[in-house]
């Protein structure tokens, strides 16, 4: 595939010319929903969810047949400061687990009929410690964005992205704070389960990173300076999905931080996205409010690897099946009250 962009300015150009959902399909789907054999509003949020999906797919009676889940993995220079309860080598070990079918996301993808792809990004070369320097050069962040862009299957009709990377809740907290404001304590959570001392280290690292990169004002530059390769890859995949009009189910805190960097650059960048779930990472709720995305599920998950969004795929599948498969009052010969 020819590179879609080679500079961050070219990514910004894409963000300035994003396609919109199809208004006619939205109107037609809403009209059909109003004639289905149920009281108005009886399916709750499923109704608006299905109409949203129809608008992005450009058809009033859509189907979900080719969902795609992509998990990106990366390593972080800040991990050396003790921000995680697990060592950095766990990232590569978990990638092998994904590839061998042994992780939670493998089971969920199989259960809901989704294609699962796993991409490890230069695990042998962690990003720079962002308390000392930008996490990535422009060339490195472009490479990661492009990995995500290329990973999206153009034939997919739903996209879910997730991550694996020791230390990435810390980089996500720094990125969220840089994009949406607030103190480090507002955004830093326990991640993999650090104790109070580990939590204090995470807060210090985020504070130092924010101070070092305080003059960076653009969302993509914040992603470069504070993010990680897998975080940038998720952003690239989310952006590619928008260009292809593929609806996206967002996963947890780290995925939403990646999405937030796009929104910080272009406020309408996430209109094709729905939050799949609210995770147990304490600041995820704050981040969902910042990006304006109420979650579909709240199950206390804090695993990452796209697991919560994968579960929400079942909700979207059900919503779309009802819109497209239910009979109208006229078709069923039922009196419309």
UniProtKB/Swiss-Prot annotation:
Record keywords: Cobalamin biosynthesis, Glycosyltransferase, Transferase
Catalytically driven reaction(s): 5,6-dimethylbenzimidazole + nicotinate beta-D-ribonucleotide = alpha-ribazole 5'-phosphate + nicotinate + H(+)
Pfam families: DBI_PRT
Functional note: Catalyzes the synthesis of alpha-ribazole-5'-phosphate from nicotinate mononucleotide (NAMN) and 5,6-dimethylbenzimidazole (DMB).
Enzyme Commission numbers on file: 2.4.2.21
Lineage summary: Bacteria, Pseudomonadati, Pseudomonadota, Alphaproteobacteria, Rhodobacterales
Pathway(s) per entry: Nucleoside biosynthesis; alpha-ribazole biosynthesis; alpha-ribazole from 5,6-dimethylbenzimidazole: step 1/2
Enzyme class: transferase
CDD domains tied to this protein: DMB-PRT_CobT (cd02439)
Molecular function GO labels: nicotinate-nucleotide-dimethylbenzimidazole phosphoribosyltransferase activity
The family this protein is said to belong to: Belongs to the CobT family.
SUPFAM superfamilies: Nicotinate mononucleotide:5,6-dimethylbenzimidazole phosphoribosyltransferase (CobT) (SSF52733)
Name of this chain's protein: Nicotinate-nucleotide--dimethylbenzimidazole phosphoribosyltransferase
GO biological process, one term: cobalamin biosynthetic process
Domain of life: Bacteria
InterPro entries for this protein: Nict_dMeBzImd_PRibTrfase, Nict_dMeBzImd_PRibTrfase_bact, Nict_dMeBzImd_PRibTrfase_N, Nict_dMeBzImd_PRibTrfase_sf
Active-site residues (renumbered): 305 (proton acceptor)
NCBIfam families: cobT_DBIPRT (TIGR03160), PRK00105.1 (NF000996)
Organism: Roseobacter denitrificans (strain ATCC 33942 / OCh 114)
